Amino acid sequence: MTRQKGGVFAVRIEGDLKHALYMYIIVRDTESVRCCDPYALSSTADHEYSAVIDPGEIIGIEDVPLSPCSDPVIYEMNIRDLTVLSSWPGEYHGKYLSLCEEGQELDGMPCGADYLAMLGVSHVQVQPVGDFEGIDERYPEMTYNWGYNPLSFLVPEGSYSTDPQDPYARVTEFRKMVTALHRKGIRLTVDAVLNHVYDLQRSDLNMTVPYYYFRWNGDGTPSNGTFCGNDLDSERVMVRQLYLRTGDVLFVLYGVNGLRLDLMGILDTDTVNRIRDRALTYDRSALIYGEGWDMPTLLGQDRKASIANQAKMPGIGHFNDRFRDVIKGGTGDDRLGEKGWLSGGEYSNEEVIAVLEGSRHIFDDAGKSVNYLESHDNSTLWDKLCACSDEPKETLRKRQVLMIKAMLLSRGIPFLHAGMEYYASKGGRTNSYCAGDAVNGFDWRRCRTEYETVKQVQEAISLRKRLDMASLKVWTSEGLYLFDYGTVRVVLNPGEHSRRWGKSVIPAFGTVVLEEE
């Protein structure tokens, strides 16, 4: 390769290089290093060699158009978790193609993509699909990892493919999965880990251009706001370009519909805005949101893509931890005993109403508030309730259903996590990133057993679609809460109160949605 204008190294090779494998040997002074291409679109198993592929074979997979989506409902899942257990009735377990299997049922209940369509969610968010460290792709059943150990931003993870050694398998099967969801009317958002790499020194980025891609402290140590050993420097031109390139590949080649930016507070506001603008050129309904936490990275407070700077990022959603804590109680390991409004704790009416109405005291647009009670991180909602209360299990079940309904009927973007609709438990584990399939897997039999609860979640999602969420006002009296959408009013009863108040305010043509207790 020869150095071109602008510092780019390039080589032109005549002939058809489809299926060719390659790696870089970079010589600096007396040292030489070998690495994969950080801009490659695919690789062989375990990131051994980069591969040349024809993007046309990905784009050529037939897709279906989707109508615009103005009120998202997100469902987070892990590709492996959803279908890895023996209760999954399909052929493929823990693979991209498992979501392409139509007509799968368990005792009459739809499974897989059919289940997600039945539930009524608009978006499925998958945990990282970029190639990551932590799973032996040749023997994926031997190890487990969520995927927050990025090796490549542009290469799909091979352990979810049927043949990790074939560079075409992972790219075509991922694209087929996206298309299968689109056929069900479901959009796909990808959990994009753009804030760090698994191993700074051995990363393709650092071996290609040492030190350039990362933030460094004055003493020469890497900035570590991610608590993963390094922070990528989003303000550097080629880092930002890599992020935009990642978006191009995901939206154009694979047809995804949104990005969840992991540890978004590591990135700067300008970069996040550029990611949004580029995404909107491909999909006018593109959904961009992330974790706007104030991370201790080497970046000025006024430039962090954090909740504190949300006004600088129009159209960017943020996970609303205030909604989470008010409704269910504290989430960290040291706060499991804390109760929220719907788990029996004491909160002022003003605090409760504020988060139900879109947290306008935090966000300048309620559409920026991603309202959630459970995600892949921390305890499941069921484990949290069991930790903070000694109430009978039946009471806790009612509390969980009521929380989910309150979230789905609140202003903002509701965010569900796979399994919370059947009271999934991780046995009290608060960080199950490598805990294995038995802990993390989606139990379709349990889902079938709790199908009545699943139907309640489905009905709440269906009700939300009929409501004018922008007009929501919440009123309270005698311990009851009235959600007023103009022509429809819904009463939530978080305690043991009379139902007379609810009946008196509902017009004769209205519908009352009440818990029995």
Model-predicted regions and their roles:
Residues 2-3, 141, 147-148, 257, ...:
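Active-site-proximal helices and loops of the catalytic beta/alpha 8
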Residues 80-254, 271-283:
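Substrate-binding/active-site clefts of carbohydrate-active enzymes
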Residues 79, 128, 190-192, 196, ...:
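A cross-domain feature marking catalytic cores of carbohydrate-active enzymes
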Residues 73-75, 124-126, 188-190, 259, ...:
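Hydrophobic faces of well-ordered beta-strands that scaffold small-molecule active sites
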Residues 3-101:
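The feature marks proteins involved in alpha-glucan
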